[in-house]
Regions:
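Short glycine-rich, Thr/Ser-proximal phosphate-binding strand/loop in the N-terminal lobe
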Residues: 13-41
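Low-complexity, acidic/Ser/Thr- and charged residue-rich accessory regions of DNA metabolism proteins
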Residues: 283-287, 321-382
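A short, charged helix-loop
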Residues: 111-138, 180-192
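Short alpha-helix plus adjacent loop in nuclease-associated cores
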Residues: 83-125, 285-294
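Short, basic/hydrophobic alpha-helical segments
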Residues: 39-59
Length: 382
């Protein structure tokens, strides 16, 4: 029987606590500094243990967190089999939740590894995206975050006006038009109002100007990303769907990554959290709750906005929405989720077929298509 060195790691910003064991032997507790030098020393020590055990294989497990996948990359590069586990799929008893320590967490991960090696139990692992996908996610998420900040600043401006009993003139219409911007700038310079109001409003307007410029830069970066060989064909196909823009397509592609890991529409729907919770026990076998909201929330947000755009246009999704709402007018949210699920499955089918095609993109045709998709005014999540 092959020998294994199994390591359960509780990872933190500055330290790592390891529980190291060989097969069924008792575990050894090791504390490591979470620095480059500390991790290099840890890898060397584990390799020395494996060599002393007659060339044993090393298995390493830690929970996914805000630390990212840097540790996974270092271990994999050193030839160590690393598993990144999903914290939400690791069952913990009530007693374990009451008494939580780093050592107990590392011990639990070690036991999961042991059960995997010795009994063949599956590990609740997460999919580890490649370095390029992670890098692409950063710019897409930055664009989403900037849009959220812009929306929050506009809400602050409205709140400031409301607190000071300043009503928007009806002649300015609705929305953040040039006329409305001009009126706000005039208020920020009007000496008839207090210094505090003018200073606060001027500060908020400067921040809005800055974020508007940033959104333009980020939109250009997204346009360039969408025209890259990795996403060109898929984005061109996806933006042809009603309600789906370049940003929505890129959020979908970068957050989901390898689309072939989903075998069918049920798996993609469950991963995105647009399926209902289930409460079945005994004769009560048809109790459904709210959606699970598992998976990337960013994808659900853009799907929701795209779904509302599709509902406003004639088509099968509008008919599906109206069919549910007609039965019960209170089920508008349920109908929206149904449209979101239909759209997600359709996007998955299209993107999977596009990414599996051997032929490369056609930059000339693609550029004009995407430029048209991005020509509309910036939307928070469009």
């Amino acid at each position: 029987m092959s020998k294994f060195i199994m390591v359960g790691c509780d990872l933190h910003d500055k330290t790592m606590l390891l529980k190291v064991a060989s097969d069924r032997d008792s575990a050894e507790k090791i504390s490591v500094q979470n620095t480059r030098a500390g991790r290099t020393r840890m890898i060397a020590d584990l390799q020395a243990k494996a060599k002393a055990a007659g060339g044993a294989s090393i298995l390493f497990a830690y929970e996914a967190s805000g630390q990212g996948f840097g540790l996974h990359d270092e271990l994999t590069a050193a030839g160590i089999e690393c598993h990144v586990l999903a914290p939400t799929k690791i069952s913990r008893s009530t007693q374990q939740q009451r008494v939580k320590t780093d050592e107990k967490d590392a011990e639990q991960l070690l036991q999961l590894l042991r059960a995997h090696v010795l009994a063949g139990n599956p590990l609740p692992t997460v999919w580890v995206p490649d370095a390029q996908t992670r890098d692409d996610r950063e710019v897409v998420r930055c664009r989403l975050d900037a849009a959220e900040k812009l929306t929050a600043l506009k809400a602050q401006v409205k709140g400031l006006l409301k607190r000071n009993h300043l009503a928007r003139p009806e002649s300015l219409g609705k929305g953040w038009t040039k006329a409305y911007w001009g009126w706000l700038r005039g208020l920020s310079r009007d000496s008839a109002h207090g210094v505090g109001l003018r200073t606060s409003l001027a500060s908020l307007l400067r921040q809005l100007d800055y974020l508007d410029d940033e959104l333009e830069r980020l939109d250009q970066a997204l346009l360039e990303l969408s025209q890259s060989a990795r996403y060109a064909v898929a984005v061109m196909r996806l933006v042809q769907l009603s309600g789906v823009g370049v940003l929505t397509a890129l959020v979908f592609l970068t957050e989901l990554g390898q689309l072939s890991r989903f075998a069918n529409r049920r798996q993609i729907s469950a991963y995105l959290g647009v399926v209902p919770k289930c409460y079945e026990s005994g004769s009560a076998n048809d109790r459904k709750g709210h959606i699970t909201r598992q998976g990337p929330s960013r994808v659900r947000r853009v799907l929701c906005q795209a779904a509302w755009a599709r509902v406003r246009r004639e088509g099968t999704d509008q008919l599906a929405y109206e069919r549910i709402v007609t039965k019960n007018p209170k089920h508008k949210k349920i109908a929206t989720v149904a449209v979101m699920r239909r759209l997600a499955v359709r996007m998955w089918h299209i993107a999977r077929e596009a990414t599996s095609e051997p032929s490369g993109p056609q930059p000339g045709r693609l550029s004009s298509s995407l430029a048209g998709a991005c020509a509309s005014p910036p939307r928070p999540l469009g």
